[in-house]
Amino acid sequence: MLQRTLAKSIGVTGVGLHSGERVALTLHPAPENSGISFRRTDLDGEMGEQIKLNPYLINDTRLSSTIVTDKGLRVGTIEHIMSALSAYGIDNALIELNAPEIPIMDGSSLPFIYLLQDAGVVDQKAQKRFLKILKPVEIKEAGKWVRFTPYDGFKVTLTIEFDHPVFNRSPPTFEIDFAGKSYIGEIARARTFGFMHEVEMMRAHNLGLGGNLNNAIVIGDTDVLNPEGLRYPDEFVRHKILDAIGDLYIVGHPIVGAFEGYKSGHAVNNALLRAVLADETAYEWVEFADSDDLPDAFHELNIRNCG
């Protein structure tokens, strides 16, 4: 299977979830083996240079997965666009933006999916590299855990737990094996969510200024405040899977393995990536030059053409 990039550059404007400021974002094609990179067009000099993404650049996970370089450059809320790039198997792309965070759009990855469909996807000459999990690796932290286990494909299983009546009406666990299920159909539409009392507290600290009922599920004392309700009966846990897929794709390659999590979040997801990369016996890099050898979970990537 070959590496791929965008067929053409494409842009979109939106609002930053935390800043509330308008953000112009452009995705560009990039050369093979260059990976996913970001560039802040609103900054000059070294701060305006291109940054190649890797798990060690995620140094702020309090509210999202945020790049923070040693020079203090920030690019926040990257998980939704990374999730969409993962769904289309984009290996190489340059993402330019004129603000410190990716626009929130509608709170899901679906607008970025549409953007990729409009841009189109092209194969490149180099073989796509996969990160294959060879043994179980687990991170436990303050009542939550995540783990990788070997698996001939890509499967994600997550469980959430919140002490709130809304969550008692929603299944807490969701599992998706991409050998038989579609990311676009099952995951892409799931929106980020938050509690009304948290929104008020965040705004008091100049955070969440761009959040509203058009780009997040807002939960009141007893119910969801969005008049249209939920897009899936279990939209909450599906969004956590959307986030996890984006967080894991920060490694820059598709993962051959199973990911499980209980009350997972950006911090433990990133810690798990780092733990795998720190143990050379836990993984290997593989290629599938013969499509017959490609695990079923990636067959949809092999035939999908956005153009």
UniProtKB/Swiss-Prot annotation:
Pfam families: LpxC. It catalyses: a UDP-3-O-[(3R)-3-hydroxyacyl]-N-acetyl-alpha-D-glucosamine + H2O = a UDP-3-O-[(3R)-3-hydroxyacyl]-alpha-D-glucosamine + acetate. Signal peptide: none annotated. One of its GO terms (biological process) is lipid A biosynthetic process. GO terms for molecular function: metal ion binding; UDP-3-O-acyl-N-acetylglucosamine deacetylase activity. Its EC number is 3.5.1.108. Zn(2+) binds at residues 80, 239, 243. Belongs to the LpxC family. NCBIfam families: lpxC. This is UDP-3-O-acyl-N-acetylglucosamine deacetylase. It comes from Neisseria gonorrhoeae (strain ATCC 700825 / FA 1090).
